[in-house]
Amino acid sequence: MFARERSDGYLRNALLDHCFVELLNDTISGEERWLKKLINSSLDIRTRLINNNTRMVVDVTNKSSIPYHIHITQCDNLKPEQKEVTLSPMSQTTLFLNGDDIKSPQYTLRASIKNAFNTEKKPLEYAFRLRGMDYMVGTESQNMYNIIPAPRSLEEKQGKFIFNKETRIILKDKNAEAPLRFLTDRLTRIAQLPLKIQNSTKSISGNYVVFSRANDPTLGNEGYKINISPEQIQVLADKEAGFFYAIQSLLQLLPPEIYSNTTAYTNEWSIPAANITDIPQFEYRGLHLDVGRHLYPVSFIKKYIDLMSMQKMNRFHWHLTEDQGWRIEIKKHPKLTEIGSMRKETIINRYSAAIPGIYDGTPYGGFYTQEEIKEIVAYAKERYITIIPEVDLPGHMLAALATYPELGCTGGPYEVGTRWGIYDDVLCAGNENIYPFIEDVLLEVFKLFPGEYVHIGGDECPKTRWKSCPKCQSKIKELKLKDEHELQSYVIRRVEKFLNKNGKKLIGWDEILEGGIAPNAALMSWRGVAGGITAAKSGHPVIMTPNTYVYLDHYQASMDIYPLANGRICALEWTYGYNPIPKELTEQEAKHIKGVQANVWTEYIKTPEQVEYMAYPRANAVAEIGWSSPEHKNWEDYLDRLQYQFK
């Protein structure tokens, strides 16, 4: 009953994700809909055609720790080569189906899951959806409109535009010049089509792609139009970002091999005919990455940015400092990376009062040099992504305190955090010496990151030390503050003044509301939506990032199936269905909701591969939340488009 109330997000989310499935040895029992949800989340199915479209290869990956014993009954007009199949845990199995000429866009493979029993104690009957010709490269049925995020308007047309060696690029607007290389580079490297660029359509014998000024105020900075026919592609925008996003849509309409890292060979490089008009819903479409708990190479940060740009996300929130590691080089304070970037070991289990922590005994550390950061910032800028750096304060500062213990309430000694969670030791709010330190750090941050916002955290700052600290209590009396919450607000406001003085704006987590929000601050609402509602009603810019919906370090499905992760369950369907505009806001108040962001905290995410595994496809869904208005979203259609993008 309570699950029907959206306010109780965790409970409803859990109920949505097969919590009523019982597992005993290898036997699964439960209500049929929960069993099907379990299987849907466990299996990844990809198809391809071979032998002149007479044989379908079906690669099935079982991502769960549960085996599935399958009896195949039929598959439309195709003949399965196997009748009995076991999908072992965490492994891939290949099925083969034969037919005279596999032309249909979709097939249904019907099977009985022999170790999954419904409430009537009968084996579960399950239908696997297999993709046919619509998902094969170089065929007459290639014309699929698999753009994510979904465009504002897409009118399907007959025919297709085929790139060939005679195709020409017509550049009529200089705003398209920089974005254009993201198309021509892939066509040259991957498709072996080094297309010529010219300024007019004179002396053109074949088809062409023309980039022109739209002169349409409704498109804003990021909107675009694309008109595709067999003879030409017309790309219209008024700003560089608009042309860039148009090119991202064109790339998604091409065969998926266009995203290969090496030369790809297909029958043709075609794009289905259509008229597209596209404008984003929100100006802020963000993805976060915590590098404080675990560090990732520069090459992966660039890949992360590439994936964001492909999906028209435009803000990368880079969480650079934590209790467990300081990851940004500060030249005035080199000890921050000499000492603060290294922890002596790392906890490897989920500990509690009843379960002691288990540690790996291995030192861990590293940081990004300022030259590396400049390189990444420039890389993001080329892809129309602004990086928002986070230096978390006054809490989550244990790595800094281990370096400079005099900045804490007790004076130390401190050590860089080795376990996850919240530490009582934070910056001493009554110590005036913390401000020169903060300002030194921020001045170097300002020079590295040209964006208007700097994130100062403000979250999870225990007041335990402040309550017993003479300096903090003296500061409360001196400023005539009510309590330690107002003391934190004093710290945030003082930092905000320094930011504003240097031409920057402050953004922080929703705890900065406690004790009174800084006057010009923007807020990220992570503890549900209440903080965002309060801030929007007060006229503050708000980014919605509630943990129930968009924390991608949370489990994607059953905690029994997936590797150790944070939080509870945050399923793809639940994420996709989220609307960042709270119903409690008036139309005018809703204008203060500037966008949405997904967060990836990395306590249990050690490698780049794990980051991708946890972030996607849910980050893909968040991209659509941020770009596409609710009336243009459709869950089933999204799944179809997503399946194609997995290729």
What are these regions (language model features)?
Residues 122-124, 133-283, 500, 505-509, ...:
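Acidic, contiguous N-terminal accessory segments
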Residues 46-72, 81-82, 95-98, 134, ...:
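Carbohydrate-binding surfaces of carbohydrate-active enzymes
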